[in-house]
Amino acid sequence: MTPLNSFALVAYLRGPLADFVDNLRRRVTPGCTHRAHLTLLPPRPLTAGVEEAIAHCENVLHETEPFDVRAGVVSLFEASEVIKLSVDSGAKQLCGLHDKLNQGPLRHAEKFDYEPHITLAQDIPTEQLQDCLRQARDEWRKVEPAATFSLSICTFVQEVKCDCWSDLTTVQLGVRNGSLSPLTNGASSVITPRTAAGHTPTARR
């Protein structure tokens, strides 16, 4: 199968925050296997080669020191009915990083302005949406003390078929003389970059 010309850059979550997102998704949208993540670049086609796009990510991220991100509140993108977790601390840095990355070989006219967030659930039947939103808010109160994480590693991903993504390579922030680590066994179905401006790497809002 020929992979699609659709690429995104994400930061996978770890620890209690990732567990909260993954567990909620599995309950609200059974069958969903996408890993919890924060999108830095929503999905886009490439007009240049993959190597050139990766080199651009490397140049930008190696010049950026790791920083803390703190998740905020559970809310809703009304137009797309996507339940998301806002970003409080770190939002300004994420927006600045997005603007630097969205240049050169990765330049793309995105449908929505970039808004840092973590997608919790989407494609929910409208009649179930408010119940799911309440459930997400109730569960988030238990996890909120673990809302801060360090953004230090990003992953460049490609859509291999509709809504199925594979990791291509990773890069550490602040490693000026380092190199991206190719993933020889990229995991498919990793995410659905539909990030309403930022979850599955698709910007639906």
Located regions from the model:
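Beta-strand-rich binding-surface signature
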Residues: R35, V82, T148
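Short, basic/glycine-rich phosphate-binding loops at helix/coil junctions
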Residues: S75-V82
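Basic, often amphipathic N-terminal segments
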Residues: M1-D68, L76, D88-P145, C162-R205
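Portal/gating segments that form or line small-molecule/metal binding sites
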Residues: A71
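Polymerase palm active-site segment centered on the conserved acidic dipeptide of motif C
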Residues: P145-L151
